[in-house]
Amino acid sequence: MAAGAAEAAVAAVEEVGSAGQFEELLRLKAKSLLVVHFWAPWAPQCAQMNEVMAELAKELPQVSFVKLEAEGVPEVSEKYEISSVPTFLFFKNSQKIDRLDGAHAPELTKKVQRHASSGSFLPSANEHLKEDLNLRLKKLTHAAPCMLFMKGTPQEPRCGFSKQMVEILHKHNIQFSSFDIFSDEEVRQGLKAYSSWPTYPQLYVSGELIGGLDIIKELEASEELDTICPKAPKLEERLKVLTNKASVMLFMKGNKQEAKCGFSKQILEILNSTGVEYETFDILEDEEVRQGLKAYSNWPTYPQLYVKGELVGGLDIVKELKENGELLPILRGEN
């Protein structure tokens, strides 16, 4: 009986192996909610989230659940800008309506239930959701001293106004973090009401709305922009500080809890086996550091391991040092 139930749960989560199959599924499931898990077999957190999906599939038979190996169908992953696993996309009427990055089972459950209900919540539930959203928006607007809510990313703006805003901030060497409103429809709509500002991009400093592109242009013209927004340290200075942040620093895809590529996962396992304390930096979260560190250390790939600010090397070198018995003395600063 238990085995049969497990098989039914697995069967409820379809697997997609090609771009053509994915497009066909979007058409076939257009009238229902489609939840797609972009996963990788090397990431244990993906296996856990597959189990969560299987449980949700049993509870919500009207929802279609699909898993797609991100590296196995790269054209689909690139189209939807999947840069890490696990990532979940939500579709209705063949259109993407929401996104969730990371292994967050409670958030996945909440999003699936909300989209599956299509506005059929009781008023009390709606009020509760509104309260949750406002709390989330407050956290997002305070996520960095200067936060830009835009269409796309600073590297790939997806509208002319967002592109101009990024250019102005870069021109004035302003340090900012960004949020892609296309990645989360709930935030996109909710922030308009939260700040009584109907358009994007929106710039916040210390959680307070400064304004959109026109306001920023006015502040630039009146030379007030430089006094309002925090300045970014020069990249080389920043990289020097980062590489010296801890005695042993690993620059990787992901973090200690969630490696987001096979090479990073392997180097974590090696470092963990030494018992030496180390810190990590997720290069997927900062494109400037990701590109700048390659030139700074003349090393083109990741992960990169540093001891006392000096580059040791990547995975292959760390493997060699371990085999030769040299890794531990280097990590301890004895060499």
UniProtKB/Swiss-Prot annotation:
- State where the protein is found: Cytoplasm, Cytosol; Cytoplasm, Cell cortex; Cytoplasm, Myofibril, Sarcomere, Z line
Provide the tissue specificity.
Expressed in heart, spleen, testis and, to a lower extent, in thymus and peripheral blood leukocytes. Weakly expressed in lung, placenta, colon and small intestine.
Per the record, the GO terms for biological process are: [2Fe-2S] cluster assembly; cell redox homeostasis; intracellular iron ion homeostasis; iron-sulfur cluster assembly; negative regulation of cardiac muscle hypertrophy; regulation of the force of heart contraction
**Where are residues bearing Phosphoserine located in the sequence?**
117, 120
Q: Quick one: which residues bind [2Fe-2S] cluster?
A: 159, 261
Q: Which residues form a coiled coil?
A: none
Q: What is its main location?
A: cytoplasm
A Pfam family (short name) is Glutaredoxin
**Domain Thioredoxin as annotated: residue spans:** 2-117
Where is the PTM N-acetylalanine found along the chain?
2
What keywords does the record list, in alphabetical order? Answer: Acetylation, Cytoplasm, Iron, Iron-sulfur, Metal-binding, Phosphoprotein, Repeat
Could you tell me which Gene3D superfamilies the record lists for this protein?
Answer: Glutaredoxin (3.40.30.10)
PROSITE patterns per record: GLUTAREDOXIN_2, THIOREDOXIN_2
Q: Where is the Glutaredoxin domain?
A: 144-236, 237-335
Q: So what does mutating residue 159 to S actually do?
A: Loss of 2Fe-2S-binding. Loss of 2Fe-2S-binding and interaction with BOLA2
Return the domain comment text from this UniProt entry.
Answer: The thioredoxin domain lacks the two redox-active cysteines. This strongly suggests that it lacks thioredoxin activity.
Describe the subunit structure: Homodimer; the homodimer is independent of 2Fe-2S clusters. Heterotrimer; forms a heterotrimeric complex composed by two BOLA2 molecules and one GLRX3 molecule; linked by [2Fe-2S] clusters. Interacts (via N-terminus) with PRKCQ/PKC-theta. Interacts (via C-terminus) with CSRP3. Interacts with CSRP2.
The entry's other comment says: Silencing of Grx3 in HeLa cells decreases the activities of several cytosolic Fe/S proteins, such as ACO1, a major component of post-transcriptional iron regulation. As a consequence, Grx3-depleted cells show decreased levels of ferritin and increased levels of transferrin receptor, features characteristic of cellular iron starvation.
The identity of this protein, by name, is: Glutaredoxin-3
Organism field: Homo sapiens (Human)
